Swiss-Prot record:
GO cellular component, one term: cytoplasm
Keywords: Amino-acid biosynthesis, Aromatic amino acid biosynthesis, Lyase, Phenylalanine biosynthesis
GO molecular function: prephenate dehydratase activity; protein homodimerization activity
Coiled coil (residue ranges): none
Signal peptide (residue range): none
Species the sequence originates in: Mycobacterium ulcerans (strain Agy99)
Encoding gene per record: pheA
Pfam families associated with the record: ACT, PDT
Primary enzyme class: lyase
UniProt-recorded name of the protein: Prephenate dehydratase
GO biological process: L-phenylalanine biosynthetic process
Site-annotated residues for Essential for activity: T182
InterPro entries: ACT-like_dom_sf, ACT_dom, Chor_mutase/pphenate_deHydtase, Preph_deHydtase, Preph_deHydtase_CS
Length: 315
């Protein structure tokens, strides 16, 4: 079974995503659905476990529909030895407010919450526990652990963690926005990408010279080839104030001619391009990369020594 690092302890949404990816047979070389979860105390630690060989893969959150992309994941992918995405899954996220058996809402004075979770239940807490004192947790499951060990009265956690720690729920399905979802990635050391499926995503990190028009020029490589960008986001390079790297997601696979040509052009144009992978999403997008055009077919025929077709005579 594949060793897969994830943000622990047992019972986090990340563990649930890991098990879903494994059950779907999306772990390269381990399509039997088996996985050996390896809990760690942060997302960067999960990715470092892959880099050091302590784990074969890591399952990490990349973005949620409430707060957007998760900076620790982005930064960890861009800095350090290269890693590659091989699969993804998206989970509907709703939380449980849990206490020890026999504790009621009136008894709750302190509550542990992972910062990302706290942001997604802020309105509920204001309405139902307005005077509660918030304590940080390093994950949703860690909040449940704090309740079980008597460090706090209540926690915002996952149903999986509540069951693991045998806690009682004050409320289930808690989330301020009913469409709250989180996307998770399966990441390993670089290798051959999964085969093209027709519903794929390709991602890269671009480091671009700080000159006028440089970003526009890079983005034009996608637009001129009819490639649909689904995300562009900047993060500081940490090398100096005002210097940024750009995370790009697009529809398509490196096996698509248009995507491959765009990546080659970016490699020529940018100071650095870090390929993060091409992988199946299971989602059908409106704009798929165009197939090889007539010019590409013509060029391939020349390379193969095939005669050019005679042009049609004018009428």
């Amino acid at each position: 079974m594949a060793r897969i690092a994830y943000l622990g302890p047992e019972g986090t949404f990340t563990q649930a995503a890991l098990l879903e990816i494994a059950a779907a047979g999306l772990v390269p070389g381990h399509d039997d659905g088996g996985a050996q979860p390896l809990p760690v105390d942060s997302t960067p630690a999960a990715l470092d476990a892959v880099r050091t060989g302590a784990a074969e893969f890591a399952c990490v959150p990349i973005e949620n529909s409430i707060d957007g992309s998760l900076a620790p994941t982005l930064d960890s992918l861009a800095i350090g030895s290269p890693l590659q995405v091989f699969a993804e899954t998206t989970l509907d996220v709703a939380f449980s407010i849990v206490v020890k058996p026999g504790v009621g809402a009136a008894d709750v004075r302190t509550l542990a919450a992972f910062p990302v979770a706290a942001a997604q239940v802020r309105q509920w807490l204001t309405a139902h526990l307005p005077n509660v004192e918030l304590h940080p947790a390093y994950s949703n499951a860690d909040g449940a652990r704090q309740v079980a060990e008597g460090q706090v009265d209540a926690a915002v956690t996952s149903p999986l963690a509540a069951a693991h720690w045998a806690l009682q729920s004050l409320a289930d399905g808690v989330v301020d926005e009913s469409n709250a979802r989180t996307r998770f990635l399966l990441i390993g050391v670089p290798g051959p990408p999964p085969p093209r499926t027709g519903t794929d995503r390709t991602s890269a990190v671009l480091r671009i010279a700080n000159v006028p028009g440089a970003l526009l020029d890079a983005l034009t490589e996608f637009g001129m080839r009819g490639i649909d960008l689904t995300r562009i986001e900047s993060r500081p390079t940490r090398t100096g104030l005002g210097t940024y790297m750009f995370f790009i997601d697009c529809v398509g696979h490196i096996a698509d001619d248009a995507v491959a040509e765009a990546l080659k052009a970016l490699h020529r144009r940018c100071a650095d391009v870090r390929y993060l992978g091409s992988w199946p999403t299971g989602q059908t997008y409106a704009a798929q990369p165009p197939p090889a055009d007539e010019a590409a077919i013509w060029l391939q025929q020349l390379r193969e020594g095939k005669p050019e077709a005679s042009p049609e005579p004018p009428l």
